[in-house]
């Protein structure tokens, strides 16, 4: 199982990489724009924040296959082993095929349906990213889409992995993992929620209180 953070916040990545067993960091154009740092600045910073380890993902901006390939080459000039995110449009599928032929790893993104995701894997994408919460927001079932996609990839494109994205709650992420999803990417707020349990803090405080009462200190 691979756990990623979906952010361009360098400080947060450095802090959470100390706590979480991170496989890397994913970004998209909206995330990069919100951080107001250009790719050639923020991507090396994110790489350094992870201690020079882990996989980085960044997305193309062009809308034609040829343009997407050119964008991919630009991204690879910044981070040599970056995974290139390509929207799974008709042109995106063509670009994924072209990048596969060049040995450049890709992630098929903006996936709203299992069939769409399967096509990106068959075209050569190493990862496929269904948008769980956005599918729910459109009246679908994000978890069912992940379940269906996982089964399709297992049967027809076992070399590819589901990398589920677009979460609003930890429960959505856990349901994806229970459905067999091999990897997830979490926004910072959801990642923080996974380690924020008021009942745990209360339990630790009670342990300290009892120990202090018995031994007059809080150390062993």
UniProtKB/Swiss-Prot annotation:
Listed GO CC annotations: cytoplasm
Active site: residue positions: 85
Broad class of the protein's primary localization: cytoplasm
Keyword tags: Carbohydrate metabolism, Cytoplasm, Lyase, Schiff base
pH dependence: Optimum pH is about 8.5. Active from pH 6 to 12.
Practical applications: Is an interesting tool in chemoenzymatic synthesis for the construction of chiral complex polyhydroxylated sugar-type structures. The use of hydroxyacetone (acetol) as a donor compound allows access to various 1-deoxysugars. Can also be used for the synthesis of a broad range of iminocyclitols, that are potent glycosidase and glycosyltransferase inhibitors, from dihydroxyacetone, hydroxyacetone or 1-hydroxy-butan-2-one as donor substrate, and a range of acceptor substrates.
Catalytic activity: beta-D-fructose 6-phosphate = dihydroxyacetone + D-glyceraldehyde 3-phosphate
GO molecular function: fructose 6-phosphate aldolase activity; identical protein binding
Control of this protein's activity: Inhibited by glycerol, inorganic phosphate and arabinose 5-phosphate.
InterPro entries to which the protein is assigned, alphabetical: Aldolase_TIM, F6P_aldolase, TAL/FSA, Transaldolase_3B/F6P_aldolase, Transaldolase_AS, TSA/FSA_arc/bac
Keyword Lyase attached: yes
Matching Gene3D superfamilies: Aldolase class I
Matching Pfam families: TAL_FSA
Keyword Lyase attached: yes
Cell location: Cytoplasm
Temperature notes for this entry: Displays a broad temperature optimum and is active in the range from 20 to 75 degrees Celsius. Although no significant loss of activity is detected after 600 hours of incubation at 45 degrees Celsius (at pH 8.0), the respective half-lives of the enzyme are 200 hours at 55 degrees Celsius, 30 hours at 65 degrees Celsius, and 16 hours at 75 degrees Celsius.
Entry EC number(s): 4.1.2.-
Gene Ontology biological process: fructose metabolic process; ketone catabolic process
Quaternary structure note: Homodecamer. Five subunits are arranged as a pentamer, and two ring-like pentamers pack like a donut to form the decamer.
Task performed by this protein: Catalyzes the reversible formation of fructose 6-phosphate from dihydroxyacetone (DHA) and D-glyceraldehyde 3-phosphate via an aldolization reaction. Can utilize several aldehydes as acceptor compounds in vitro, and hydroxyacetone (HA) or 1-hydroxy-butan-2-one as alternative donor substrate. Is also able to catalyze the direct stereoselective self-aldol addition of glycolaldehyde to furnish D-(-)-threose, and cross-aldol reactions of glycolaldehyde to other aldehyde acceptors.
Something else known: Is not inhibited by EDTA which points to a metal-independent mode of action.
Family classification: Belongs to the transaldolase family. Type 3A subfamily.
Protein name (Swiss-Prot/TrEMBL): Fructose-6-phosphate aldolase 1
Lineage: Bacteria, Pseudomonadati, Pseudomonadota, Gammaproteobacteria, Enterobacterales
């Amino acid at each position: 199982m691979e756990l990623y953070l979906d952010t361009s916040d360098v400080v947060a990545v450095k802090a959470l990489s100390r706590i979480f067993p991170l496989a890397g960091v994913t970004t998209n154009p909206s995330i990069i724009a919100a951080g107001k740092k250009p790719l050639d600045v923020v991507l090396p910073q994110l790489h350094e924040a992870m201690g020079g380890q882990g996989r980085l993902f960044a997305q193309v901006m062009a809308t034609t296959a040829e343009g997407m390939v050119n964008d991919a080459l630009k991204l690879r000039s910044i981070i040599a082993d970056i995974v290139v995110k390509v929207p799974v449009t008709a042109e995106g599928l063509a670009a994924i095929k072209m990048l596969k032929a060049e040995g450049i790893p890709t992630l098929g993104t903006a996936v709203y349906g299992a069939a769409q995701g399967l096509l990106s894997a068959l075209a050569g994408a190493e990862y496929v990213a269904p948008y769980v919460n956005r599918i729910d927001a459109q009246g679908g079932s994000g978890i069912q889409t992940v379940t269906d996609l996982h089964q399709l990839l297992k049967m027809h494109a076992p070399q590819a992995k589901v990398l589920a994205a677009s979460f609003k709650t930890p429960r959505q992420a856990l349901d994806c993992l229970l459905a067999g999803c091999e990897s997830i990417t979490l926004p910072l707020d959801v990642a923080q929620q996974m380690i924020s349990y008021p009942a745990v803090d209360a339990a630790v405080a009670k342990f300290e209180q009892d120990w202090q009462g018995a031994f007059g200190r809080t150390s062993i």
